[in-house]
UniProtKB/Swiss-Prot annotation:
It comes from Xenopus laevis (African clawed frog). The keyword Lipid metabolism applies. May be involved in lipid metabolism. This is Tetratricopeptide repeat protein 39B. The keyword Cell division does not apply. The gene is ttc39b. One of its GO terms (biological process) is lipid metabolic process. Keywords: Lipid metabolism, Repeat, TPR repeat. Belongs to the TTC39 family. TPR repeats lie at residues 292-325, 483-516, 524-557. InterPro entries: Iml2/TPR_39 (IPR019412), TPR-like_helical_dom_sf (IPR011990), TPR_rpt (IPR019734).
Length: 586
């Protein structure tokens, strides 16, 4: 069995040569399994997805790491395609992986043994292989739970998924205790022990980080059944895991990148640590210069820094880097759609939304709404050249709505509600629908990095404002539209540093609260924006008061959960406390 280093000195040609020369192993112990799975991981990151699967397949029912790696790739594929047969394949393979891991676990294992209620098992009661089986079993359980939610909407599956997540969480906590005890006794010194440590840091880090993001009302409920989340603990565990040399180091890196480049923006206030993201990505850009996943994150960081032109080039490079997983192309199309939207190149943005609506199954309702919204920003003569009918597109949206884990997708519900204006024989046009969706996705935080583009967006908003003020035919939507325009205008002014003018816009929305008929979300979101404005002015108490008003005084409005995530992040920052309940694994 050839040893494959996961150091940065190996280039992509080396990985390909090594793969071509590697024989199918005649036996597979833990050390050999880790070496071969490292090879498969390198192939995967180098766009050799099928080769990675083929390397793992022969031992997928005999080795815990081959089982985990093989099933994880298929689960990723199913999550990206959303094809029922792919989801079923992912579930079947993950069941087999769980069975493989179960065979290697110690009987009466860490979580399930009744004796553990009295005394915990320590690491020296388990062999190295049994310790790794626990970690791999926990990872498989998490993925199986996620697929359970996607596959079927019924409550039984939802409960089953929740139980799997809790079991996985408990295993990670017990493994953390085993690792801490063994490390304190100087027993964590072999390479396989370091690999176990990497698994613990990934699991404890990811669980704590993701749980810490949850609004306090949700977290209080989860704490009642044994969950807790501490953001700083989560970040520190992931950083330590990312800086190590275990097979899971790259998984820690990707988790941190996802947090910094997506979660912080969509579910937070947009204060992403891009310097850390760039530092984490740099060695992998050198090691996998054409790796599509690595290129994707490099381009995403460029977007968040306002370097839209550079991001577009990198996304195009990502697209041409591989043709096997088209779903990575779809991720690029989504980002390119926003890149062009930020620059108000509505026609090019529409083209990417059109590609998504035809090729991707992730959220047809969102893609078709985006198409119609983007076309709505264009002159009628330009729309005619596309051959599209805006009204017909909006009318399609409701029929395309889907459910995941028994719940409608919030952005789809929002799109459906907005589209209902077009159901009647005399539809009332939406006002600035593409900019409204940009706000929903926190895109103004990104545009705000570029004063020139923010000024251009402000001009578009002010034109819409004048048109509404001069409207001779008053509709039932007029007050809502005027409030939307003032909210968007205020956000632009805030990013341009014109805080007093922004405050006037926000207050105008709040004063119009009783006149709003449909878009009730505008009021709590405006209170939230005012709170952020006062934070920027240094008025901490006023900022907290306004954000607490958004949190406590409104309910049952569109995108409520998304705002509560952002409120949680903002209040935690203002109050100087960790975004969590500060607990350590126990």
């Amino acid at each position: 069995m050839a040893f494959v280093s996961n150091g940065t000195e190996a280039d992509e040609e080396g990985f390909e040569d090594a793969y071509e020369n590697i024989p199918v192993a005649s036996k597979m112990d833990l050390r050999c399994a880790l070496e071969e799975c490292t090879m498969a991981l390198n192939l995967f990151l180098n766009n050799k997805f099928s080769e990675a699967l083929e390397l793992l397949r022969p031992w997928a029912k005999e080795s815990i790491y081959h089982a985990l790696g093989y099933s994880t790739i298929l689960v990723m594929q199913s999550a990206m395609t959303f094809e029922p047969q792919d989801v079923q394949m992912g579930i079947t393979t993950m069941k087999e992986a769980l069975q493989t891991c179960q065979r290697f676990r110690k009987r009466n294992t860490v979580v399930e043994s009744l004796s553990n209620l009295v005394s915990k098992q320590s690491g020296d009661q388990l062999t190295e292989e049994e310790m790794h089986a626990e970690i791999c079993y926990a990872e498989c359980l998490l993925q199986k739970a996620a697929l359970t939610f996607v596959q079927d909407e019924n409550m039984i599956n939802f409960i089953k998924g929740g139980i799997k997540i809790r079991t996985s969480y408990q295993i990670y906590k017990e493994c953390h205790q085993m690792y801490s005890l063994a490390a304190s006794q100087g027993k964590m010194c072999s390479d396989t022990h370091y690999q176990f440590e990497g698994g613990v840091k990934l699991g404890i880090g990811a669980f704590n980080l993701m749980l810490s993001l949850l609004p306090s009302r949700v977290l209080r409920l989860l704490e009642f059944i044994g969950f807790s989340g501490n953001r700083e603990l989560g970040l520190s565990q992931l950083r330590e895991g990312a800086s190590g040399s275990s097979i899971r180091a790259i998984l820690c890196v990707l988790t941190l990148l996802f947090y910094h480049t997506y979660i912080s923006l969509i579910l937070g206030t947009g204060e992403a640590n891009l310097e850390e993201a760039e530092a984490l990505l740099e060695p992998y850009l050198k090691k996998f210069p054409n790796g599509s996943i690595i290129l994707f994150y490099a381009a995403r960081i460029d977007i968040l820094k306002g370097r839209f032109e550079q991001a577009q080039e990198t996304f195009q490079k990502c697209i041409v880097s591989q043709q096997e997983w088209k779903q990575i192309h779809h991720l690029c199309y989504w980002e390119l759609m926003w890149c062009h939207s930020f620059q108000q190149d509505w026609l090019q943005a529409y083209r990417y939304a059109d590609l998504l609506s035809k090729e991707s199954k992730w959220s047809k309702a969102t893609y078709v709404f985006q198409k119609a919204a983007l076309l709505s920003m264009l002159p009628e003569d330009v729309v005619k050249t596309t051959g599209e009918d805006i009204v017909a597109l909006f009318r399609q949206v409701e029929s395309l709505k889907q459910r995941i884990a028994g719940k409608s997708i919030p952005t789809e519900k929002f799109a459906v509600r907005k589209s209902r204006r077009y159901i009647s024989d005399n539809p009332v046009k939406l006002t600035l629908p593409a900019l409204e969706m940009m706000y929903v996705w926190n895109g103004f935080t990104i545009v705000g990095k570029r004063a020139d583009l923010t000024e251009n967006v402000l001009v578009t908003i002010e034109k819409a404002e004048v048109a509404l003020q001069n409207e001779t035919k008053v509709t039932e939507y007029l007050a809502d539209d005027l409030c939307l325009v003032q909210l968007l205008k205020g956000v632009c002014l805030k990013h341009l540093g014109r805080l007093l003018q922004a405050e006037l816009c926000f207050n105008q929305v709040i004063q119009s609260e009783k006149r709003v008929k449909y878009d009730h979300y505008l009021i709590p979101f405006t209170f939230y924006e005012l709170g952020l404005l006062y934070k920027e002015q240094g008025d901490r108490d006023k900022a907290i008061r306004y954000i607490e008003t958004a949190k406590g005084n409104y309910k049952d409005y569109s995108l409520e959960s998304r705002l509560h995530f952002r409120i949680h992040a903002a209040l935690s920052s203002l109050k100087g406390s960790p975004v969590s309940t500060p607990t350590t694994p126990s």
